[in-house]
């Protein structure tokens, strides 16, 4: 004996599973809407990515047409849906101690500086980068109050929630040493088996806040000894890259370091940043 869904439920299920049409006009509108708010340049080869990310948002709202969703955005420039739109289109690929060659350079730089050592993680994502910075500084400088601090920001408010929680799957910590895992994380038990959480003693040194690098003004606790802005600039055009680098200059202390992603080159964009190591730049203030 078989049973079937009522007609209305069947219709709704079909709407939720069938592929929605993303026209050239829709894609162009999306590109024009995201660029001024997040600086993201959407080339045509990003179409499938845009579809896959936004279609989930449409379905969560019960919408079946991209045009209706874009009309919803444009009808209210202050709607909270704009943040959900931005969250959907930002990329959050990260890992603990990603681009591992940066962290010995950070440690060496921190040893040679006096006063409170301050670092800004400008694209913190789900927290792996700022916690990697924090572990490096704790190992290098100790945990005396006022010795160091990490400020971590991201445009995506959803990933910041995960970052603040400090909870990760155990397999995500494969790049940590056994000593770091024991010193800085607590293992979950029972229903939390397989999860770990950043110990509060380390988390206290990391402050998270939402921040858009395209904002007219940065509310950050600078100046900093180092800024991590890795694998972010690749999503911006050259004019936006230059503007962000120009705004970093007064936020870095003399001889401060700027850490870039593996495919990013800043030397030709801002003459005050000179290459110090592999994708690491030093600021010289004349």
Write out the residue ranges for each language-model feature.
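Conserved AdoMet
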Residues: 2-120, 261
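Residue-level signal for inorganic ion chemistry
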Residues: 106, 227, 252
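Conserved class I S-adenosyl-L-methionine
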Residues: 116-129, 148-151
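Conserved SAM-binding loop of SAM-dependent methyltransferases across substrates and taxa
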Residues: 126-143
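Extended basic-aromatic, gly/pro-enriched interface segments that bind polyanionic ligands
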Residues: 146-228, 232-240, 265-267
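Core SAM-dependent methyltransferase catalytic element
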Residues: 226, 267-286
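A short glycine-rich, Lys/Arg-flanked "PGG" loop and its adjoining helix->strand segment in the class I
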Residues: 242-254
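Conserved beta-strand signature within the Rossmann-like core of class I S-adenosyl-L-methionine
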Residues: 254-262
């Amino acid at each position: 004996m078989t049973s079937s869904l009522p007609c209305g439920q069947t219709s709704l299920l079909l709407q939720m599973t069938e592929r929605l049409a993303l026209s050239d006009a829709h894609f162009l509108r999306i590109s024009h809407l995201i660029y001024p708010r997040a600086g993201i340049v959407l080339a045509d080869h990003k179409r499938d990515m845009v579809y896959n990310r936004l279609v989930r948002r449409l379905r969560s709202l019960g919408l079946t047409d991209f045009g209706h969703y874009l009309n919803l955005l444009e009808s209210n420039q202050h709607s909270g849906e704009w943040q959900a739109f931005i969250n959907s289109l930002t990329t959050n690929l990260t890992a603990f101690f990603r681009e591992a060659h940066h962290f010995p350079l950070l440690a060496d730089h921190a040893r040679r500086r006096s006063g409170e050592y301050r670092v800004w993680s400008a694209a913190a994502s789900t927290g792996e980068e700022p916690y990697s910075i924090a572990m490096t500084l704790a190992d290098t400088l100790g945990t005396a109050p006022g010795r160091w601090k990490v400020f971590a920001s991201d445009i995506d408010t959803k990933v910041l929630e995960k970052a603040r929680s400090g909870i990760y799957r155990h397999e995500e910590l494969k790049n940590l040493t056994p000593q770091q895992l024991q010193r800085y994380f607590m293992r979950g038990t029972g229903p939390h088996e397989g999860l770990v959480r950043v110990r509060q003693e380390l988390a206290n040194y990391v402050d998270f806040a939402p921040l858009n690098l395209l904002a007219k003004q940065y509310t950050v606790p600078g100046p900093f000894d180092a800024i991590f802005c890795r694998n972010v600039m690749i999503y911006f055009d050259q004019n936006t890259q230059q503007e962000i680098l120009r705004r970093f200059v007064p936020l870095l202390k003399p001889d401060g370091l700027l850490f870039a992603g593996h495919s990013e080159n800043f030397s030709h964009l801002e003459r005050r940043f000179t290459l110090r190591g592999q994708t690491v730049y030093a600021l010289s203030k004349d």
